[in-house]
Amino acid sequence: MIGKLKGLIDSYGEDYVILDVQGVGYQVHCASRTLQALPQAGEAAVLSIETYVREDQIKLFGFRSDLEREWFRLLQTVQGVGAKVALSVLSTLPPSDLADAIALRDKAAVARTPGVGPKVAERIVTELKDKAPGFASVDPAVAHLSGAIEERSAPRPVADAISALVNLGYGQPQAAAAIAAAARSAGDAAQTAQLIKLGLKELSK
């Protein structure tokens, strides 16, 4: 199995690059975000490789990092997600943003991927929620709060305060982070109005 290729960029196709490794041209399929980050023809490049072997073909998928390749593998553990959809997701969201979106249960961010509808986005967020925190950059408390809201187990004042901030135009991750900070400073007895006020202060920092 091929795990990594280092060579010169020969040419580009719509969704692949030809990498010349000591005179042998390897066709490597990549996410559009990865292709855009690669150098021009004639320059050196290194790609982490995932090798797919089928009865009728061998296909190579390339990634800028081992982490991106790991997400490619994780995504395909989700029902309804194959290699094409996984690459599409990674074209829309870099690994760090994907991890944060899953940790925050942000289905809308995942659903922005072409070819990924609400149901598939929900499956990605739900089935990978236990694997994302290790990769995510978000505060674990914020991720926990977002999960509680998704599961309808968050305290009512907290859920209402986040909903109010979202209605004011803030994104779900922003609102959850602000209210999580507000709840920490205000304590368990804080009511919705107080949380909204403190949350807005957090957002204005």
Swiss-Prot record:
Region (Flexible linker): 144-153
SUPFAM superfamilies found in the cross-reference section: DNA helicase RuvA subunit, C-terminal domain (SSF46929), Nucleic acid-binding proteins (SSF50249), RuvA domain 2-like (SSF47781)
Region (Domain II): 65-143
Alphabetized SMART domains for the sequence: HhH1
Alphabetic keyword roster: Cytoplasm, DNA damage, DNA recombination, DNA repair, DNA-binding
Molecular function via GO: ATP binding; four-way junction DNA binding; four-way junction helicase activity
Main location: cytoplasm
Entries under Pfam families matching the protein: HHH_5, RuvA_C, RuvA_N
Quaternary structure and interacting proteins, as annotated: Homotetramer. Forms an RuvA(8)-RuvB(12)-Holliday junction (HJ) complex. HJ DNA is sandwiched between 2 RuvA tetramers; dsDNA enters through RuvA and exits via RuvB. An RuvB hexamer assembles on each DNA strand where it exits the tetramer. Each RuvB hexamer is contacted by two RuvA subunits (via domain III) on 2 adjacent RuvB subunits; this complex drives branch migration. In the full resolvosome a probable DNA-RuvA(4)-RuvB(12)-RuvC(2) complex forms which resolves the HJ.
Domain notes: Has three domains with a flexible linker between the domains II and III and assumes an 'L' shape. Domain III is highly mobile and contacts RuvB.
Record-stated family: Belongs to the RuvA family.
UniProt name for this protein: Holliday junction branch migration complex subunit RuvA
Protein's organism: Rhodopseudomonas palustris (strain BisA53)
Gene name in the database record: ruvA
